[in-house]
Amino acid sequence: FTIEDLLKHYLQKKFHILERLATIYDKLGVVMRKASKYEQALDYFTKAQNIIDINHIKNPELTSDIYNDMGVIYINLDIFDKALANYQKAREIRESVENPDLEQIAYSYHNIGTVYQRQKKYADAITWHKKALEIRQEIYPDNEPIIAASLTMIGNDYTQAAKNDSSYHFNDAFEYFAKGLEIRKLTLGETHPDTAWSYQSIGLWHFYQGEYEEAIENYLKCLSIRKTILQPSHAYTAEISYLLGEAYLKINQIHSAKEHLLLAEKIQASLHKVKALEKTQHLLKECSLS
């Protein structure tokens, strides 16, 4: 062996070890994210990204996954500009490889659409979510749960758009929700977290049209599922509890409203969800005045 051969072998081994370390950090970040420990998750993802960047490691799949995972954290922290930037970087990498993974590209499109939805840019949200749906319909059977995810998100887009823009109509949303829920109940079952999302979405659809009893009926189904399968302090449990409190307040059932809002407040405070906590505390004040 020449010195050059030994150096090359050393560098290859070094990069392999660093690549493995970045992968481990990324997986640890995912574990923290699933436990709603977003700051710890972001720390792990940042460590993974730094290893990739500093050492110029060429692994498009891993790099795009890290950017995507960071985007998930930022959207959960309501930092939408950073979420969008990371999702776009993941998309660019996934589209640029020699043999693009259409499934992963669809995920990027879906995630970008979700950021636009949260930013209330509904036309952009619909565009990106429909792009994701088109790809998924090409590569999956019609009753795949991933198809239901796209259908439900497009329903959400139309619901939010109709709430804020008179050029959209609530009826545009319902066919997407109904088909999405049908697929999820058939393939995932009644107690799956994605089925809970369908019930929450349909509940919101009713709420925005002033159909509060129907909203509560769907919200309660969602809450029942989440209490069964999620940790007690999960952000999604807080979210549906807030929505229930809001709906009960609309029909002047103050005791029920306060019960659910207090649960939401407790969870949001533990997760440092400042904006959500402010909204919950505002509704609690309304309960006190009623």
Language-model regions, residue ranges each:
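Conserved alpha-helical positions within TPR/SEL1-like repeat arrays
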Residues: E19-K34, E61-N76, E103-R118, P145-Q160, ...
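Residue position in alpha-helical solenoids
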Residues: T2-Y10, V31, I51-I54, I93-V97, ...
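Short coil/turn linking the two alpha-helices of tandem helical-hairpin repeats
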Residues: G29, H56, E98, G113, ...
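Helix N-cap/loop-to-helix boundary motif
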Residues: L11-E19, H56-S64, D81, E98-A106, ...
